[in-house]
Swiss-Prot record:
The lineage of its organism: Viruses, Riboviria, Orthornavirae, Negarnaviricota, Haploviricotina. The signal peptide region modulates GP's high mannose glycosylation, thereby determining the efficiency of the interactions with DC-SIGN(R). N-glycosylated. The mucin-like region seems to be involved in the cytotoxic function. This region is also involved in binding to human CLEC10A. Residues 55-202 are annotated as: Receptor-binding. This is Envelope glycoprotein. Residues 306-486 are annotated as: Mucin-like region. Residues 673-677 are cytoplasmic. Glycans are attached at residues 41, 205, 229, 239, 258, 269, 297, 317-318, 339, 406, 420, 435, 463, 564, 619. It comes from Reston ebolavirus (strain Reston-89). The record marks L58, L64, F89, K96, I171 as: Involved in receptor recognition and/or post-binding events. The chain crosses the membrane at residues 652-672. The gene is GP. Residues 315-326, 363-423, 432-472 have a biased composition (Polar residues). A lipid is attached at C671, C673 (S-palmitoyl cysteine). Filoviruses entry requires functional lipid rafts at the host cell surface.
Length: 677
C-alpha cells in the first residue's frame, strides 16, 4: 500500500512544482510591469520614467524634427534674374538666426559676391559657425555691382536663407544658401551603425566626391545694378564669352547652351569680349524641375544643331595690346525641327523614351569635380551617336571685320537615314587674335543630331570615338537612356530610396516637386508620414513692408502632389490625421517640459500618461499604392480562370494550412503537459 500511495503521489508533486514555476513566471511578469508607485527616486528624469512606464509605447517626440523646406518645391522661378527680385536691402533691422535639424535636398542654391560702386562690399561676412548649404545640385555664383540701398539683404516674401542647419534672415557674402522656410515634420529615426563614428562636422558634403551620385555644378554669372529696379545679368561661358539673360530659364538650358557654344567654337578670342543674345524663338525653359534628374520634354529640348550664330556688330578698341581688342555682339537664333514624331514610340503612350549619349544624372557633369565651374569645360574631340532629323544649316554674317574671332564653319548636308550615324568632331584650335591669320574652316558631316549637347570625360571620349560605337552603348546596361514617366507613383513619393529614379506628372504646370528628400546630421532617408505644422518665417513678426506671405498657400505644393486626382480625398484624410497626431505630440512635449520639476507627466499621472497616437501613414499609403497598382499597372483579373491560386478549390489552401497548424500546436501542448506531469 505504501509503495502504491507513493506512486499515486508522484504526479501530484510534479504538478505542484509546475504550478509553482508558473506562478513565479506570472509574478515576475507583474513585477516588471508594476505601476509607477514603486518609483520613489525623485531625481529620475521624465524620459527615464517614460521608459519605465510606457516602454514600447510612443511617449517621446524625438521623431519631431525641425526641417528646412526649400521654396523651389512650390514651383517658384529659380533663375538668377527672377530670384534676385525676391531679395532686397533694408536698414535698421537686426538679423536673426534659427537652427534646424534636417534639411531638404536643393536643386538650386546661390552664392553672391556684390560690391558697391566705390568698391566696398554689399554683403557681410558669415558669422562663425555658418557654413554653406551642403546639398545643392546647381550653385548659381553671382558676382557684380549694385547700389545696395541698405545695410543687409533680406527676403521680400518673408522667407529664410537656409545654410548648413542654420536659417538666417540675411544673405552672407560668399556663402552658399537656399531659399526656404522652417517647418516641423515627423521624420524616421536615423539609422545608427555601431561601427561607424559620427564625423565632427556632419553632414558631410557628399558633393566633394566626383564619383558621388549627387554632384554639384557651379554656374557663373555677372550682374550689374544688383538690388535696383533694372538689373542686367550675363551668363559666363568663359572669361571673355557671355550670354545675355533676358527671360526666365532653367539651369539645364544654360548647361546645354554652354556645351553648344563650345562645340560650335563660338567662344571669344583671348583679348576680346563676345556677348551673345538669345532670339525670342528660343525657349530657355527646357527641362523641368525633377529633383536631381535632367528630365526633359523632347518637344522642348534645345537642339544645338538647330541654333544659328550671327555676329551683329563689332566695336573696335584701339588701345594697347594688354586691353581687349574689341567687344563683339552676336545673336543666337533657333530653327526648330519640322517633326520629331518618328522618335516617339507608339507602343507605350504613357512613356516617352529619349536616348542620350551618357548617364542620366551625369550628362551635364561628366569630367567635372566639385567646385569646378561651368567655365571649366573643354572642347575635346568626341563622338556622338545621333538620331535622324531635318538637316541643319548655319548662318554666319560674312561682313565681319578681321578683328572679330573667326567662328565660321562649313557644313555638308547629308540626307537623313533610318540608322544612327556617328559624327567625328575634330579638335578645335584656340581662336586666333585680330593680328593673326584667319582660322581655316572645319568640316562637319551631320544629319542634325537630336540629342542634347553634353560633356564627357576623356575616358568616355576615348571609348566613344571608336567607329560604330556610341557613348550610350559604351556605357553598358547600367547607363540606360533617359525615360520620362508621366504616371506619378505614390510609393516613390512617400518612401523613396536615396538613388531611386523619380517619376514626373505629365501636367506639371507649376513644376512642383512631388517628393521630399531630406538630410540630417546623422543619416539621410525619406520622410515618414505627411505630418507637418505650418512653417514659421521672419515675416511672421511683421518686420517687412514689401511682399506678402504668399508662401503659406501650398507650402509644400499641396504636400508636393503626393497622389493624383483619384486618391486626393484619401490624401486629405491622411493629412488631417497626421496633423492631429503632430499637435498631440507638441502638446505632450510642452507638458513634459512644464512638469519636469515634479518628475514629469508620468510621475504625476502614472500609467495613464502613456499616449500612443498610432501613425497609420504606411497603411493608408499602401492602400493608395494598391489602388494605383490595380487600376494602372495591372489589368482586371479574370474571375473565370480557375488556374488562379486563390480562386476555385485552391482558395481552401490557406484554411487548410491554418487548421493543420492548430492541430500541430495542440499535439505539441499535450506532449509538453505529458512530460511535465
Amino acid at each position: 500500500m505504501g509503495s502504491g500511495y507513493q506512486l499515486l503521489q508522484l504526479p501530484r508533486e510534479r504538478f505542484r512544482k509546475t504550478s509553482f514555476l508558473v506562478w513565479v513566471i506570472i509574478l515576475f511578469q507583474r513585477a516588471i510591469s508594476m505601476p509607477l508607485g514603486i518609483v520613489t527616486n525623485s531625481t529620475l528624469k521624465a524620459t527615464e520614467i517614460d521608459q519605465l512606464v510606457c516602454r514600447d509605447k510612443l511617449s517621446s517626440t524625438s521623431q519631431l524634427k525641425s526641417v528646412g523646406l526649400n521654396l523651389e518645391g512650390n514651383g517658384i522661378a529659380t533663375d538668377v534674374p527672377s530670384a534676385t527680385k525676391r531679395w532686397g536691402f533694408r536698414s535698421g533691422v537686426p538679423p536673426k538666426v534659427v537652427s534646424y535639424e534636417a534639411g531638404e535636398w536643393a536643386e538650386n542654391c546661390y552664392n553672391l559676391e556684390i560690391k558697391k560702386s566705390d568698391g566696398s562690399e554689399c554683403l557681410p561676412l558669415p558669422p562663425d559657425g555658418v557654413r554653406g548649404f551642403p546639398r545643392c545640385r546647381y550653385v548659381h555664383k553671382v558676382q557684380g555691382t549694385g547700389p545696395c540701398p541698405g545695410d543687409l539683404a533680406f527676403h521680400k516674401n518673408g522667407a529664410f536663407f537656409l545654410y548648413d542647419r542654420l536659417a538666417s534672415t540675411v544673405i552672407y557674402r560668399g556663402t552658399t544658401f537656399a531659399e526656404g522656410v522652417v517647418a516641423f515634420l515627423i521624420l524616421s529615426e536615423p539609422k545608427k551603425h555601431f561601427w561607424k563614428a559620427t564625423p565632427a562636422h556632419e553632414p558631410v558634403n557628399t558633393t566633394d566626391d566626383s564619383t558621388s551620385y549627387y554632384m554639384t555644378l557651379t554656374l557663373s554669372y555677372e550682374m550689374s545694378n544688383f538690388g535696383g529696379n533694372e538689373s542686367n545679368t550675363l551668363f559666363k561661358v568663359d572669361n571673355h564669352t557671355y550670354v545675355q539673360l533676358d527671360r526666365p530659364h532653367t539651369p539645364q538650358f544654360l548647361v546645354q547652351l554652354n556645351e553648344t557654344l563650345r562645340r560650335n567654337n563660338r567662344l571669344s578670342n583671348s583679348t576680346g569680349r563676345l556677348t551673345w543674345t538669345l532670339d525670342p524663338k528660343i525657349e530657355p525653359d527646357v527641362g523641368e524641375w525633377a529633383f536631381w534628374e535632367t528630365k526633359k520634354n523632347f518637344s522642348q529640348q534645345l537642339h544645338g544643331e538647330n541654333l544659328h550664330f550671327q555676329i551683329l556688330s563689332t566695336h573696335t578698341n584701339n588701345s594697347s595690346d594688354q586691353s581687349p581688342a574689341g567687344t563683339v555682339q552676336g545673336k543666337i537664333s533657333y530653327h526648330p525641327p519640322a517633326n520629331n514624331s518618328e522618335l516617339v514610340p507608339t507602343d507605350s503612350p504613357p512613356v516617352v523614351s529619349v536616348l542620350t549619349a551618357g548617364r542620366t544624372e551625369e550628362m551635364s557633369t561628366q569630367g567635372l569635380t566639385n567646385g569646378e565651374t561651368i567655365t571649366g569645360f573643354t572642347a575635346n574631340p568626341m563622338t556622338t551617336t545621333i538620331a535622324p532629323s531635318p538637316t541643319m544649316t548655319s548662318e554666319v554674317d560674312n561682313n565681319v571685320p578681321s578683328e572679330q574671332p573667326n567662328n565660321t564653319a562649313s557644313i555638308e548636308d547629308s540626307p537623313p537615314s533610318a540608322s544612327n550615324e556617328t559624327i567625328y568632331h575634330s579638335e578645335m584650335d584656340p581662336i586666333q587674335g585680330s593680328n593673326n591669320s584667319a582660322q581655316s574652316p572645319q568640316t562637319k558631316t551631320t544629319p542634325a543630331p537630336t540629342t542634347s549637347p553634353m560633356t564627357q570625360d576623356p575616358q568616355e571620349t576615348a571609348n566613344s570615338s571608336k567607329p560604330g560605337t556610341s557613348p550610350g552603348s559604351a556605357a553598358g546596361p547600367s547607363q540606360p537612356g533617359l525615360t520620362i514617366n508621366t504616371v506619378s507613383k505614390v510609393a516613390d513619393s512617400l518612401s523613396p530610396t536615396r538613388k531611386q529614379k523619380r517619376s514626373v506628372r505629365q501636367n506639371t504646370a507649376n513644376k512642383c516637386n512631388p517628393d521630399l528628400y531630406y538630410w540630417t546630421a546623422v543619416d539621410e532617408g525619406a520622410a515618414v508620414g505627411l505630418a507637418w505644422i505650418p512653417y514659421f518665417g521672419p515675416a511672421a513678426e511683421g518686420i517687412y513692408i514689401e511682399g506678402v506671405m504668399h508662401n503659406q498657400n501650398g507650402l509644400i505644393c499641396g504636400l508636393r502632389q503626393l497622389a493624383n486626382e483619384t486618391t486626393q480625398a484619401l490624401q486629405l484624410f491622411l493629412r488631417a490625421t497626421t496633423e492631429l497626431r503632430t499637435y498631440s505630440l507638441l502638446n505632450r512635449k510642452a507638458i513634459d517640459f512644464l512638469l519636469q520639476r515634479w518628475g514629469g507627466t508620468c510621475r504625476i499621472l502614472g500609467p495613464s500618461c502613456c499616449i500612443e497616437p498610432h501613425d497609420w501613414t504606411k497603411n493608408i499609403t499602401d492602400e493608395i499604392n494598391q489602388i494605383k497598382h490595380d487600376f494602372i499597372d495591372n489589368p482586371l483579373p479574370d474571375h473565370g480562370d480557375d488556374l488562379n491560386l486563390w480562386t476555385g478549390w485552391r482558395q481552401w489552401i490557406p484554411a487548410g494550412i491554418g487548421i493543420i497548424g492548430v492541430i500541430i500546436a495542440i499535439i505539441a501542448l499535450l506532449c509538453i503537459c505529458k512530460i511535465l506531469c
